[in-house]
Structure formats: structure tokens, C-alpha cells
């Protein structure tokens, strides 16, 4: 059995976790407006629930404003407006002719600290899931009952090396997010 089987299992699973982490961290509000905040909003339109990004162009208007311009203003502007209000994002949308403007107030120190706490919680969840993936990989190695104990130890060491790389990457991502949140 080649070491790649185990390392690929570990890496593929960990990469999926990191993709989820990046998506979750992008949803945490920072001092700057982020269009990704609206990626998961589903708007009632044309008799179905559709992603907002399929119904409107979302653009940042520096320094603290997002402008949402529906492709079909007549049919969708009110539905988009209502969904933003319902989503409880801590912002107040304003309909301005054929577009919706959303001003992001500056974050207070309290809201920054709350966002940092939220980011740490998400990172810790991934940290726990990485431990679980590592454990599952090590159990796969053990279950496959290698005749050569040295080879089994080699595999375990390789998994640990890769795990340490992911942990370091996780810490870097957390520090970057905290730095981003602390910028005034």
C-alpha cells in the first residue's frame, strides 16, 4: 500500500474543511464592506428561491458602501430589499431608484472583539475536525495491518508532518483574520 493513499485522504479531507473555513470567515463582518456577505442569501423571485448573485450585480463603493443593482429592477428590487432586512446582517438597505445602497457603519471596538471571537470559534471548529481527520487516517493505517512496523511508523510520521503544515496554515489564517478585524 503506498503512502500516497493515506496522505491523499488526509489532504483531500482537510482541503474541504479549509474551503468551508474560508467561506465562513468571509461571512464575518469586517471594517470594510464585503460582497461575499450576500453570497448565501436566497431571494424569492419568479416563484422560486434564487441566490442573490443570480439576480443582481453586487459592487463595493469605497469606503463603506455596497451597491446592489438588480438585473430585473421591476420584479426583484423589493424582494432583494426584504431579504437583506430579513437576513439580520446588521445593516440598513436603502432603495435608491434602480439600485439598493447599503452603508456599513464603522465597527465599534466591541463589535470588532465580537467578530474576533466568532472567527476564533470557527477556527477552533476546524482545528477539532483536523484532529478527527488525523485520527481517522491513523486508524486507516492501523486497520490495513502492514507487515512492516517501520513502514507503519513512517506513514504515521508523514501524516503528522502534513497535519503540522495544516495546523500552521490554520494559525496563519486566524492571525490574518484578526489583523483584518482590528484595522480601523
Curated annotation (Swiss-Prot):
GO terms for cellular component: cytoplasm. Its main location: cytoplasm. It is found in: Cytoplasm. The keyword Cytoplasm applies. Pfam families: RRF (PF01765). Gene3D superfamilies: 3.30.1360.40, Ribosome-recycling factor. It comes from the Bacteria. The keyword Cytoplasm applies. Signal peptide: none annotated. One of its GO terms (biological process) is translational termination. Keywords: Cytoplasm, Protein biosynthesis. GO terms for molecular function: ribosomal large subunit binding. HAMAP family: RRF (MF_00040). Responsible for the release of ribosomes from messenger RNA at the termination of protein biosynthesis. May increase the efficiency of translation by recycling ribosomes from one round of translation to another. PANTHER family: MITOCHONDRIAL RIBOSOME RECYCLING FACTOR PSEUDO 1, RIBOSOME RECYCLING FACTOR. Belongs to the RRF family. This is Ribosome-recycling factor. It comes from Mycoplasma pneumoniae (strain ATCC 29342 / M129 / Subtype 1) (Mycoplasmoides pneumoniae).
Amino acid at each position: 500500500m503506498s503512502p500516497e493513499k493515506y496522505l491523499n485522504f488526509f489532504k483531500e479531507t482537510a482541503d474541504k474543511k479549509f474551503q468551508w473555513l474560508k467561506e465562513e470567515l468571509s461571512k464575518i463582518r469586517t471594517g470594510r464592506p464585503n460582497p461575499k456577505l450576500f453570497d448565501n442569501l436566497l431571494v424569492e423571485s419568479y416563484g422560486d428561491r434564487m441566490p442573490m448573485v443570480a439576480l443582481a450585480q453586487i459592487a463595493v463603493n469605497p469606503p463603506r458602501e455596497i451597491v446592489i443593482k438588480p438585473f430585473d429592477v421591476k420584479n426583484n428590487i423589493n424582494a432583494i430589499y426584504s431579504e437583506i432586512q430579513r437576513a439580520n446582517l446588521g445593516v440598513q438597505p436603502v432603495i435608491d431608484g434602480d439600485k439598493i445602497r447599503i452603508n456599513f457603519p464603522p465597527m465599534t471596538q466591541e463589535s470588532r472583539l465580537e467578530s474576533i471571537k466568532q472567527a476564533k470559534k470557527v477556527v477552533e471548529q476546524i482545528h477539532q475536525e483536523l484532529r478527527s481527520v488525523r485520527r481517522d487516517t491513523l486508524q486507516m493505517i492501523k486497520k490495513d495491518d502492514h507487515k512492516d512496523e517501520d513502514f507503519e511508523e513512517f506513514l504515521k510520521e508523514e501524516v503528522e508532518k502534513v497535519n503540522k503544515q495544516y495546523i500552521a496554515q490554520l494559525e496563519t489564517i486566524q492571525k490574518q483574520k484578526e489583523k483584518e478585524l482590528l484595522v480601523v
